A protein has these predicted regions:
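Glycosyltransferase-associated regions of secretory-pathway enzymes
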Residues: 1-56, 72-232
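Small-residue hinge/turn detector
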Residues: 58-69
């Protein structure tokens, strides 16, 4: 989204996806294959204001609900195949931050997953432009965390399973071992590294910037699609 070319460094990270999962298909989502005009008013307003990060929050969920697969932010470097993780209906990982909420740099699910359907529904009746003219800066991480808490999620550093959704929540070392203070904490569990390559918040919101350095600079939605439970 936004039409910017993906930088060389990020293309290097993306090459790691194909290196470790050569049989998977890589799909990019943008204005050519997603209809902004048909999206909820929240998405249209965010797009009109050039807030690509918030547009991508919705579009990644839409693509996953439609097709299933694994979504990666383009600043995610893969270290090994994700095949062993394809045992649950859906999976996501925590980010190492004070809030201990699930991050969105890596999301995996089967097509038509109820968890993702419920996340999409959160956007149906809200506006990006608030009545006073300000913009709704609520991140998808905040929305997701609050919604999952109603299903039993607890903000802590432990792996969790949300049975109602078939959702596995992995610890931060699986997908995002770099902490908000830039300390690398890889482990035997690590499948990928989130490099926090871009920023969409200002210095006033430094904690969120350190934790969610993604998307607006990248402006590309990448979905890795594969055959999941017989779905092409």
């Amino acid at each position: 989204m936004g039409g910017k070319e993906i930088p060389t460094q990020l293309r290097g990270y993306m090459a790691s996806w194909k290196q470790f999962m050569p049989e998977w298909e890589i799909h990019e989502w943008n204005e050519k294959n997603f209809s902004i005009a048909s999206a909820p008013v929240y998405v249209r307003e965010a797009y009109e204001h050039g807030k690509w990060a918030f547009v991508s929050d919705y579009v990644r969920l839409w693509a996953l609900e439609q097709y299933g697969g694994v979504y990666f932010d383009t600043d995610v470097q893969v270290l090994r195949s994700f095949e062993p993780l394809l045992v649950d209906t859906a999976f996501i990982g925590l980010e190492e931050s004070l809030a201990q909420l699930p991050g969105t740099c890596v999301i995996g699910c089967e097509p038509h997953c109820q968890w993702v359907k419920d996340m999409l529904a959160l956007y149906n009746d809200i506006h990006f432009v608030l009545p006073d003219g300000s913009l709704d800066q609520t991140t998808n991480v905040q929305r997701m965390g609050e919604m999952l808490k109603t299903k039993g999620f607890v903000a802590c550093r432990k792996e969790q399973y949300i049975a109602g959704y078939g959702l596995r929540v992995y610890t931060h070392d699986y997908f995002s071992p770099i902490t908000s203070t830039r300390v690398m904490r890889k482990s035997k569990n690590t499948y990928s590294i989130h490099h926090f390559a871009g920023s969409w918040t200002n210095k006033k919101h430094h904690r969120l910037r350190d934790t969610w350095l993604v998307r607006e600079t990248i402006n590309a939605l990448i979905q890795i699609k594969r055959k999941l439970k017989g779905i092409d």
